[in-house]
Swiss-Prot record:
UniProt similarity note: Belongs to the methyltransferase superfamily. RNA methyltransferase RsmG family.
Gene Ontology CC, one term: cytosol
Signal sequence range: none
Species annotation: Streptococcus pyogenes serotype M4 (strain MGAS10750)
Function per UniProt: Specifically methylates the N7 position of a guanine in 16S rRNA.
Sequence positions that bind S-adenosyl-L-methionine: G78, F83, A129, E130, R148
The protein, known as: Ribosomal RNA small subunit methyltransferase G
Gene Ontology MF term list: rRNA (guanine-N7-)-methyltransferase activity
UniProt cross-references to Pfam families, sorted A to Z: GidB (PF02527)
Keywords assigned: Cytoplasm, Methyltransferase, rRNA processing, S-adenosyl-L-methionine, Transferase
EC number(s) per entry: 2.1.1.-
Protein localization: Cytoplasm
Primary localization: cytoplasm
Amino acid sequence: MTPQDFYRTLEEDGFSLASKQKEQFDTYFKLLVEWNTKINLTAITEKNEVYLKHFYDSIAPILQGFLANEPIKLLDIGAGAGFPSLPMKILFPNLEVTIIDSLNKRISFLTLLAQELGLENVHFFHGRAEDFGQDKAFRGQFDVVTARAVARMQVLSELTIPFLKIGGKLIALKAQAADQELEEAKNALCLLFGKVIKNHSYQLPNGDSRFITIVEKKKETPNKYPRKAGLPNKKPL
């Protein structure tokens, strides 16, 4: 997917990008490739692949109608090189984006990236989701939490749902169908008061299958969740 294909596809979906937004995506690509030689950000560095498998893939929840251009508080867990939240932010500047990542070098990259792209209302924090999930400044504060290929739902639910307001939504982006994952996550979702409200499949322009699972938080998360760092992965609910 060339940048021109990317812009044309967005326009066909009703999103006509301004020159500034196109420049932001171009700068994003250049910085991603440059920094990838210093720290491991991505295995995908070929331009057309980045536009398809990172940029287009990241904004799919918007193109599929699951996110609006409103000043909502969005948290991205394990965003790595900023996916999916920063491409979403470029497309929808009204979003207030927070990223938590466990690797400080990635936070350094994201901080520089946001400055170079001129993004406002973006916040980056170094640490583990399990620790921030018990912090009152973060717990129960977000309208949306996004996670792209972070962990299976049984683990992911404990890392994300505590951050949501009641009625807030987890948007999980997956490369594989989530049916089996959701079956395994039933107990975790029950304990965390999360309800699956959508399990959506779609295709990238090249025909690759992708999946979005949306979970809504129904009640306040019990205080004991998330458990200490590492436990959700070692002993899933």
